[in-house]
Amino acid sequence: MTFARLALRTALTATVLAALPGLAAAQMSHQHTSEAACEEALLRCATKVTPAFGPDGTLWLAWMAGGRISVASSKDQGKSFSTSVQVTEPQLDLDWGPDARPKIAVDARGGIALAFSIFRDKAFNGQVLITRSTDGGRSFAPPKPITANNASQRFEAIGFDPAGTVFAAWLDKRNRAPAQQNGQTYDGAALFFATSRDGGETYSDARIVADNTCECCRLGLAFDGNGHPVVAFRNIFEGGVRDHAIVTFADLGSPGEVHRVSRDDWQIAACPHHGPSLTISPEGTYHVTWYTNGKARKGLFYAQSRDGGKTFTDPLPVGQVNRGPSRPQIIAGPDGLAMVWKEFDGTKTSVNLMTSHDDGATWSKPRAIADTNDASDHPLLVSDGRQTYLSWMTKADGYHFQAIEAEP
């Protein structure tokens, strides 16, 4: 593996799952066939790794490996990690969908909230489980469902608002069966949410934001300058068009109007398995990146909104179309905006970077900052308030944690 201006690299190695079975043909994925993954619950066996920083600068990782969720921490920006803690003891049928991964968030006092999904049957009906740690990650409460409803739930997103309340959103199919029983068609799932004011121990009753969302794409979650949740998601618009939408909450319990991010006109009766990424800058600008294969445009795109998500700029193409750009991530960090995504040149997968220092008005030229010759997880971005980092799990080269450096 080659890292341009490599800042940090762990000595840990990993095995990442090969191409996942049963994915829709529409999915853009760079996971290629290889030998079976190892079955241990160690980071080197992880298929998905999610980072989060605590208020003291501690880096936390949550990962899937061996049918279990595990957590470890680093006090030296990823150079070394603590002994891992298994959040789940028995092996579970964890949601291995391309956009599924454990979610971890840390509050101002160091409390940890964690959520993940499992499959409950062979029809891929899911269940969102939640847990928390109140002792600095040394132990976690037994996982339990986020809602008592037994309909399928997947693709959760969680985060702490500035006051320390956990906000959780997920895709939920509870309204599908009643609609069909009444002779009505019901496409996709619904966007639901709940909140926890005790650090993730208990959650409020689930409430709906919108029906007929795409059922298989991750959510983008951020908080605006007022501490209100903002959720980006792939919606199902009239005619079966699966384009992206966004909703801003007036408070933790009051979702606002759903607005369209872009008119890509991707009409597809299948699962794209490719959700958006959302960040909100200190200026209050919404920044969204996404993938589409629509009639109006194809590939990765970026747009911004300066009116609270009501309207967005014309989509800006991202990446080289002939290299299948995929899995975009964007973050508003201390040095401005950073955006990463994956490309595949026929031999290797690279992580590419663009940065902006004027709130998205202009962007640097794309440059590759990492590559690998085998399967890999999505590239993720995380910030400790002083530095932005790339977090990337690879099969051949292990887990890597790399500082995003300024343009040369």
Labelled PLM ranges:
Residues 27-408:
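Extracellular, repeat-based ectodomains that mediate carbohydrate processing or recognition
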Residues 1-6:
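N-terminal secretory signal peptides that target proteins for export/translocation
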